[in-house]
From Swiss-Prot:
It comes from Bifidobacterium animalis subsp. lactis (strain AD011). Its EC number is 6.3.5.-. The lineage of its organism: Bacteria, Bacillati, Actinomycetota, Actinomycetes, Bifidobacteriales. Keywords: ATP-binding, Ligase, Nucleotide-binding, Protein biosynthesis. This is Aspartyl/glutamyl-tRNA(Asn/Gln) amidotransferase subunit C. Belongs to the GatC family. InterPro entries: Asp/Glu-ADT_sf_sub_c (IPR036113), GatC (IPR003837). Gene3D superfamilies: Glu-tRNAGln amidotransferase C subunit, N-terminal domain. It comes from the Bacteria. It holds the Pfam family GatC.
């Protein structure tokens, strides 16, 4: 049963550059110990007769049939746009002049 010490919690906070109060350290210590106990209980599961697998869920692609459809006209595509200009969507600039 792994247990996290107060010193380890403080060290983790320092690594993350997070200042922890005494109350937060106590709470984090308790929560991390519960998580570590849960991980330990999962590791105790008997897996000797379980075949190793990369993914427990079968990987199958469920695709719809590729049926041609009538595309939207430019006017229909732009009809829901808040701002359109010269047949194009207008969006606010997100990158400044750098």
């Amino acid at each position: 049963m792994p247990t996290f010490t107060r010193e380890e919690i403080v060290h983790l906070g320092d690594l993350a550059r997070i200042a922890l109060t005494d109350e937060e350290i106590t709470r984090m210590q308790s929560e991390l110990n519960v998580i570590a106990d849960a991980i330990d209980s999962v590791q105790e599961v008997a897996t000797a007769d379980v075949e190793p697998t990369a993914n427990p869920v079968p990987l199958e692609a469920y695709l719809r049939p590729d049926v041609p459809a009538t595309p939207l006209t430019q006017a229909e595509a732009l009809s829901g746009a808040p701002v359109a200009e010269d047949g194009m969507f207008v969006a606010p600039r997100i990158l400044g002049e750098e």
